[in-house]
Amino acid sequence: MAQWKNLAFLQKEVFFESRAMEEWLIEMRRSIHRIPEPGNKEQKTSSFICKMLEEMDIPHRSYGTAVVGLIEGKEPGRCVALRADMDALPLEEPSDRPYASLHHGYMHACGHDAHM
């Protein structure tokens, strides 16, 4: 039963932390949404991700267009791996929104900009 109380506490913490970062998170997603790139050609996207990781003091390495960040816990034990696709779809974005795709013929139409 105690583990469920801890889970509820954690859910509340995540909720409040994400609310505090909401405007920043929206701007980051929109920034990524503006620069969709085809698979294995995500140069601008991977550079953007590296810049964000640097600003958050998260150690990282680039492998071509792939980026790996390392977030270590305070205690030894189990770990979690998170993965996010960065590629865009070859579609024209029919939008006049200020964060619409700047790359003709490509768009993040499947939510990858939210994954990152």
Q: What role is predicted for each listed range?
A:
Residues W4-H108:
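Acidic/His- and Gly-rich active-site-bordering loop/insert found
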Residues M116:
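DPxDG-like acidic metal-binding loop motif
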